[in-house]
Amino acid sequence: MAPGRTGAGAAVRARLALALALASILSGPPAAACPTKCTCSAASVDCHGLGLRAVPRGIPRNAERLDLDRNNITRITKMDFTGLKNLRVLHLEDNQVSVIERGAFQDLKQLERLRLNKNKLQVLPELLFQSTPKLTRLDLSENQIQGIPRKAFRGVTGVKNLQLDNNHISCIEDGAFRALRDLEILTLNNNNISRILVTSFNHMPKIRTLRLHSNHLYCDCHLAWLSDWLRQRRTIGQFTLCMAPVHLRGFSVADVQKKEYVCPGPHSEAPACNANSLSCPSACSCSNNIVDCRGKGLTEIPANLPEGIVEIRLEQNSIKSIPAGAFIQYKKLKRIDISKNQISDIAPDAFQGLKSLTSLVLYGNKITEIPKGLFDGLVSLQLLLLNANKINCLRVNTFQDLQNLNLLSLYDNKLQTISKGLFAPLQSIQTLHLAQNPFVCDCHLKWLADYLQDNPIETSGARCSSPRRLANKRISQIKSKKFRCSGSEDYRNRFSSECFMDLVCPEKCRCEGTIVDCSNQKLSRIPSHLPEYTTDLRLNDNDIAVLEATGIFKKLPNLRKINLSNNRIKEVREGAFDGAAGVQELMLTGNQLETMHGRMFRGLSGLKTLMLRSNLISCVNNDTFAGLSSVRLLSLYDNRITTISPGAFTTLVSLSTINLLSNPFNCNCHMAWLGRWLRKRRIVSGNPRCQKPFFLKEIPIQDVAIQDFTCEGNEENSCQLSPRCPEQCTCVETVVRCSNRGLHTLPKGMPKDVTELYLEGNHLTAVPKELSTFRQLTLIDLSNNSISMLTNHTFSNMSHLSTLILSYNRLRCIPVHAFNGLRSLRVLTLHGNDISSVPEGSFNDLTSLSHLALGINPLHCDCSLRWLSEWIKAGYKEPGIARCSSPESMADRLLLTTPTHRFQCKGPVDINIVAKCNACLSSPCKNNGTCSQDPVEQYRCTCPYSYKGKDCTVPINTCVQNPCQHGGTCHLSESHRDGFSCSCPLGFEGQRCEINPDDCEDNDCENSATCVDGINNYACVCPPNYTGELCDEVIDYCVPEMNLCQHEAKCISLDKGFRCECVPGYSGKLCETDNDDCVAHKCRHGAQCVDAVNGYTCICPQGFSGLFCEHPPPMVLLQTSPCDQYECQNGAQCIVVQQEPTCRCPPGFAGPRCEKLITVNFVGKDSYVELASAKVRPQANISLQVATDKDNGILLYKGDNDPLALELYQGHVRLVYDSLSSPPTTVYSVETVNDGQFHSVELVMLNQTLNLVVDKGAPKSLGKLQKQPAVGINSPLYLGGIPTSTGLSALRQGADRPLGGFHGCIHEVRINNELQDFKALPPQSLGVSPGCKSCTVCRHGLCRSVEKDSVVCECHPGWTGPLCDQEAQDPCLGHSCSHGTCVATGNSYVCKCAEGYEGPLCDQKNDSANACSAFKCHHGQCHISDRGEPYCLCQPGFSGNHCEQENPCLGEIVREAIRRQKDYASCATASKVPIMVCRGGCGSQCCQPIRSKRRKYVFQCTDGSSFVEEVERHLECGCRECS
């Protein structure tokens, strides 16, 4: 037997043994350990918030609770929860789950609670929960579910709480809830439900909570049952509103009368819906059982497609794999097209169960191997296209079930041989394509030549690639004897039937036996396909710079030697040598390696010789050679090693020779260990020598004494490896995330092999130039930065870049060569910038681009942008979002749909648009400055002499700015630091004349006078008794010409002035005041007091006498009035009533002596009255009477922790209580109080309730509050207004909150039945006056204030005159209405005519009254016009003179606010939204929306909150099947 054959047989046996070992491991008992990163406690497993993308493996079988919320899980498979038979609680909320495979919960028999809310589910598979009979709570809210199929909840008969709110549900199939007999809570709010079948809730006897609000309910005859059903159950289904038809929009379903629920035309049963028809993926289109997802950028096979599909088209996407059972549920599928994707991995059972499949198209992918059994069971398959892949092997039984196959294409693959018998099962084959494969025409392919000669079905012209003697010859034309085998060919191909075949010699290489010599070929990377038999691989003298981790050595089990010498290798990636356990010799001599780490040699466990000579290595770390326990020879000769970390060679247990010569070793304290190691180990080393310090130079390291290895100062070990991830970022494999870090530049330490780089949300102003050095990048996210400009060739080195995100920056201009070199780019996002133009040719290199985002840019759509519109239309690379902003004729038009001929140039372009790509065109540099473009600042100005600043607007001639103060003169001077000098006027000094010298430093003021500095002088302020310029003259105030004392007072001179001695009866400093001695007079009996000098005189009334009129006349006691000794206050008059004195109070006052002010009139703008807080208790009764003719104002206000206000609002009384711990509550009076009359208002606070009573009517209550209102404890009570300094700060203000004061009268304010006294009125400026005089003038009418002290009267009917005190006559007395009724209008009247008459006096006969009897309206009602002519008012959907024409299906735009119910608050959009209402006839079909889109709107709620929600807007109406 040949040696080669023996070796191959051993390899096969080794693989079989390995497979058996793996099978035994996999079949063993599962580990009970906790999944990685998760936390396990008892029977609970917590994996929440770990960023997981899939359900982790290894979940303990005894788990009862599993938390997987707040991760990034996208798919739930059938295997994820296998064996978890004890699980009771499962949390999957807040993930990205879009697919749940059927049977995913089949083992969860004990499951009680399942949360799947806040995911991306669009389809709810039928029978998903049939194996969870104990489920009681199921939360599916906040997903994207579109329909509820009939069998969705089969099996969960015990569920009590089902939450389906905040989805996109528009269809609920009949019987969907039939199994839910124990259901108590059902939430369906915030969906798109328009119809609900009458049987939907019949089987829910225990239902106590039902939420249906915020849907699109169409209230026609089919929904009448729901109105009755809700009226019988008033506590559930609250806020359920009609949204159509238009005349019922906004009405509560329960409140609409049954007669209003009508259907147009004949009707019987409600139209049924099909939930499966709604399960079309959002990126695809579905019609006629065909799903079309072509060119949608999909990365995986869409799940939950309509079950009845017969064809799916997935070509031209980015799908990389086909998972197990991807199409198993689509039993009717006949055609699958997944061509032109990136598929490299296909599960063996990907097409399982597709017995009806006739066509399978897989061409244009990256398939290298067909898994065993992939096509098994496809008995109906007729067309199979596998061309344009990378298939290098086909097992002999690959096509064993394809008896009906007609056409098979294997064109353009990597097949070198085909096993005999591969095509034997193909009994119906008619066409076979095998060309463009590198066939090795040896003895193993002889059968194919015979087969093709007998069956001439190969039509593509398959040819031999090797050996050379048969190269390029057609296989079908070569004679059988030409197919011969050499030794290597036999070794290579004999196991081809099981895909153990080997490859031919790589291009540019030479193969001799098992030696593959690829040296000196200028290769930049290791060839991707090498023969399996290779033992010696020679790659020396090439241009390889980086050794990638491609896994190439895993395919070379026989490899023993690798020569990579004399390349340009700078980096060896981790895992580059994985699978090279059999390699014994590795040559890396003569490269450019600078650093080494243990991961770079991973996989070389059998290595014996390692040559690293002549590199740039500077240090050797203690993990550099980890795992190389078999190395015997290590050469580090001729490097730049200065230090070696202790223990660097410890793992080299087999080492016998090490070459460390020609290295600049620094023999400091860190190298002491090496001397000891060399002396201790008997090893050949060549005696490496020290180069530093100087006194140890050229001394062998092993000869240096231990005390001579010293460190001076801070000599750190230089072998500390730099981190592979910047400290501001996080790195996972080759993905680097530096988002929202406030970065201004690219962080240092970026891994060279980074493939995805996220830099969004930083402060970058330009694309970092360093990015061009990272050539492996496939994705760059630079969104939400401040990048304002791109430069040409910015990304030209990034040949692998497929996604570039530049959205939400400040980009103003796109240079024509900005994207040159990006031939692999598929996604370019320029969304949300300031781009107005894109030069033609900018996208010439973007040959792979499939998606371009240009939305939210102010595009200027003239002729220069015509090319872009054509380019977009040609490839549909822009999804129809980008709109034109200018010129005006193109505003708001889509680039995708606007006809090309509309892109025209008319007149000059706005300079602000042109300047975006050349800011200098807008002449930003002033004062003759020179402008030049700048990539960051947009432009830069070079200023002329004497100007500076960004725009050259700051003058350097500082005299222009008048720097000299106080009138100083400026002179330019180069010798001064500031370039100028000042000539100061007298009295000032300093560089800018800013200093006024103190002239008081040397003054002549006398007698302790005060000196006051002036400008170049000073003044003396004299003390008392002194005068003169210098205060040197004495003053005598008592000389006659200076005596100031009055009324003959005596002047007395003092040292510091004078004083006056007053005569009796006078006072004051100068005796200027005549004292009023009547202030405390003793005159009696109403005598008049007359003041005199130092006394007073009493003038007695008639009959009285005495000094104080104390003697009455004779008989006076019999004539004394009771009022004589009774004093009335505030100008009241005393009268005698029943022999008792009584005060007749003026308006506004009350009390026995009119001492209390109980009525005040508020006439000022900011008037108010303040009552002390002590007057109000937490439980209080406040009452008052109000008279006003104003609509709004503040009656009462109390501001503290729980603000309370009693307001006049639109003529009604409004009570507002605004607790800071809960939403504000409001109640309004039914009565109006703005008629000028007095109305009683009462506020009662008791037992956590607030009640409002107006005019003794029915109380209005705010209901039970959370706590007792804390009114009146810490702050005052304001009536009629508030101080301007206070404001309504404590109350949450709204658009309807009146901030103005009250204008009118407030009378009899009582707090806890105690009448309040307003005596302590504010100052008159506040506009509060006693009484309410203006309201008592008009006898039979209402007072209206026209000025501060003036009123006019508005009389009641039947009264007239200025004061409404004259009785008016009835104007209808003696009226002249002939055939009608007289109606009085003030002082006149009008005639209301009877039917058949007209005219001012109803004296003209009208013959048009019966005109409608002969005028027929088919679909409307007849009316008479102002001219007496009949006309038809048509029903919606009809037109014509007689409403006989049915309108075509058209959309009518209605602008109105969209309403939502959020908990107990009513919410509406901030502005009116255009809504399209479809009206018109469609015959047997229905007029319905056929095109719509979703837009985001802001909703504002009555509780003060707001939120943003996507709302579906209809764009086009048409006829379609009724649903």
From Swiss-Prot:
Ranges of residues in domain LRRNT: 34-61, 271-307, 496-532, 716-752
LRR repeats: 62-83, 86-107, 110-131, 134-155, 158-179, 182-203, 308-329, 332-353, 356-377, 380-401, 404-425, 533-554, 558-579, 582-603, 606-627, 630-651, 753-774, 776-797, 800-821, 824-845
Keywords carried by this UniProt record: Developmental protein, Differentiation, Disulfide bond, EGF-like domain, Glycoprotein, Leucine-rich repeat, Neurogenesis, Repeat, Secreted, Signal
Localisation per UniProt entry: Secreted
Residues carrying covalently attached carbohydrate according to the record: 72, 192, 563, 622, 784, 792, 797, 928, 1025, 1181, 1247, 1406
Disulfide bond entries: 284-293, 441-464, 443-485, 505-511, 509-518, 667-690, 669-711, 920-931, 925-941, 943-952, 959-970, 964-982, 984-993, 1000-1011, 1005-1020, 1022-1031, 1038-1051, 1045-1060, 1062-1071, 1078-1089, 1083-1098, 1100-1109, 1123-1134, 1128-1143, 1145-1154, 1305-1332, 1355-1364, 1372-1382, 1377-1391, 1393-1402, 1412-1422, 1417-1432, 1434-1443, 1449-1487, 1467-1501, 1478-1517, 1482-1519
SMART domains per the UniProt record, alphabetical: CT (SM00041), EGF (SM00181), EGF_CA (SM00179), LamG (SM00282), LRR_BAC (SM00364), LRR_SD22 (SM00365), LRR_TYP (SM00369), LRRCT (SM00082)
Signal peptide annotation: 1-33
Boundaries of every LRRCT domain copy: 215-265, 437-487, 663-713, 857-907
GO cellular component: extracellular space
Pfam families (UniProt xref): EGF, Laminin_G_2, LRR_8, LRRCT, LRRNT
Main localisation: secreted
EGF-like domain: residues covered: 918-953, 955-994, 996-1032, 1034-1072, 1074-1110, 1119-1155, 1340-1365, 1368-1403, 1408-1444
Gene3D superfamilies, per database record: 2.60.120.200, Laminin, Ribonuclease Inhibitor
Domain of life: Eukaryota
All copies of domain CTCK, residue ranges: 1449-1523
GO function term, MF aspect, one: Roundabout binding
Annotated GO biological process: animal organ morphogenesis; aortic valve morphogenesis; apoptotic process involved in luteolysis; atrioventricular valve morphogenesis; axon extension involved in axon guidance; axon guidance; cellular response to hormone stimulus; negative chemotaxis
Laminin G-like domain location: 1158-1332
Protein task: May act as molecular guidance cue in cellular migration, and function may be mediated by interaction with roundabout homolog receptors.
Protein name: Slit homolog 3 protein
Protein source organism: Rattus norvegicus
UniProt lineage: Eukaryota, Metazoa, Chordata, Craniata, Vertebrata
Gene field: Slit3
